[in-house]
């Protein structure tokens, strides 16, 4: 949950912070297929009409970083050339992960372990978590998105769910929220993709 915290010193100085407090241990629903690799098992599950949560271990794209607007590629020419993050804060995937439409400090340990996929060819897909590219390139970059694949439903999240996870409470809570969403009846993606589009998205770099 989001908690406002204030500190005043002799009525002269005033500071205010937002603090995010998450449960230590939670049990998430598991009525879906969980995968770390896009492979034939994932394709078969989708063709059988199953729900799939794919958190790819290896994915093409740009490694993201959390940075304030000052540290942007307009002023500093350095990778990943991203100027911010746009979040669909009203999406039910965030039902148990309070967020605004921009990346506040609870996104630090998520974005520093994430990859933004280039989704230019997926014209109908709007990312749920989207990295904002510099105006020089203006690529459509997605960290999370969902789609209907035939009779199946797919949610892709490109953020490391394992590395240093004991030190990343926000990532644990985001995973919990996403897992419960994917397992729920609310997980009914509207936009459709074809298997060949996923194949191209995950094809090895030449």
Regions flagged by a language model, labelled:
Residues 25-28, 183-191:
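Short, charged low-complexity linker/loop segments at the C-terminal edge of domains
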Residues 10-13, 148-150:
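Short strand-coil-strand connectors
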Residues 13, 38, 139-141:
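Residues that act as N-cap/strand-start positions at coil-to-secondary-structure junctions
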Residues 170-182:
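Short amphipathic C-terminal alpha-helix that caps PH/PH-like domains
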Residues 12-30:
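Short beta-strand elements
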Residues 2-9:
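Short, small-residue-biased leader/transition segments that mark boundaries at the very start
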Residues 26, 30-77, 148-155, 178-181:
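Short alpha-beta junction capping motif
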Residues 1, 58-63, 71-169, 186-206:
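Catalytic beta-strand/loop cores that center a nucleophilic Ser/Cys/Thr
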